[in-house]
């Protein structure tokens, strides 16, 4: 399997930083606005495009992003999100599978999946176990957006050997340039401390303004922007300290 790199050994902690700090950035909620999508696509470096399947420009933008050399992922709606593709607790697995198939068909070239909302759904152990097995079968990775402390998604991915990473920092819960800049700097500090950081933002004008200004400065600050496939290899499917102990995700 392309991303299945890991045979976890009990008690092995995540690798200590070796001097190089790595960062991956995901922009969620794409496919809604050609103007915002194009501005996001123009961000420098390997920024990941997370595209919602139930948006008017999902398929066209996925093709455009792939052609531009960006990593494309499916931004999968999960409860409390609504719509024809959304996953909800209590929906039979056969219907969840149908919705996943339909969503992936709307976002060609998807290399992986992350959850849109999903605070209730990512806590559903049976559904997450099935999803991680299905993603592994399809040679896709999973990004746990960690919209809930009760998530078991990354733990189930790790248990099954499905390639995955988890979000460390949300950039734009507060939509001001000052707050977004602080969050980005928090991500930089975290990358330096633990060797890597995964950040998620949205195509808000304020977020794009900050990233357009700050991304060209990352290298001077000792941080290398890498794509998610490289981040998965760098982290070797291990949990960061905020998400588990000794490299193991908390499995609530």
Model region roles, listed by residue range:
Residues 2-5, 11-252:
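Catalytic-site microenvironment of enzymes
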């Amino acid at each position: 399997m392309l991303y299945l790199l890991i045979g976890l050994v009990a008690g092995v902690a995540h690798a200590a930083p070796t001097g190089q700090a790595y960062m991956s950035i995901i922009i969620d909620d794409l496919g809604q606005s050609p103007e915002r999508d194009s501005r996001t696509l123009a961000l420098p470096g390997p920024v990941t495009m997370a595209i919602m399947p139930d948006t008017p420009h999902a398929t066209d933008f996925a093709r455009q992003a792939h052609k531009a050399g960006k990593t494309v992922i499916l931004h999968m709606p999960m409860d409390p999100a609504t719509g024809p593709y959304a996953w909800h607790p209590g929906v039979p697995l056969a219907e969840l599978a149908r919705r996943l198939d339909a969503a992936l068909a709307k976002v060609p070239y998807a290399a992986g999946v992350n959850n849109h909302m999903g605070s209730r759904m990512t806590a559903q152990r049976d559904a997450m176990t099935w999803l991680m097995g299905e993603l592994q079968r399809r040679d896709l990775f999973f990004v746990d957006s960690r919209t809930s402390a009760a998530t078991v998604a990354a733990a189930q991915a790790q248990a099954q050997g499905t390639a995955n990473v988890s979000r460390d920092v949300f950039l734009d819960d507060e939509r001001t340039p000052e707050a977004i800049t602080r969050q980005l700097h928090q991500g930089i500090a975290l990358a330096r401390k633990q060797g890597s950081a995964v950040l998620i933002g949205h195509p808000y004008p304020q977020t794009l303004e900050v990233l357009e200004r700050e991304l060209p400065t990352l290298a001077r600050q000792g941080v290398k922007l890498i794509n998610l496939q490289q981040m998965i290899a760098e982290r070797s499917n291990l949990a960061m300290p905020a998400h588990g102990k000794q490299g193991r995700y908390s499995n609530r």
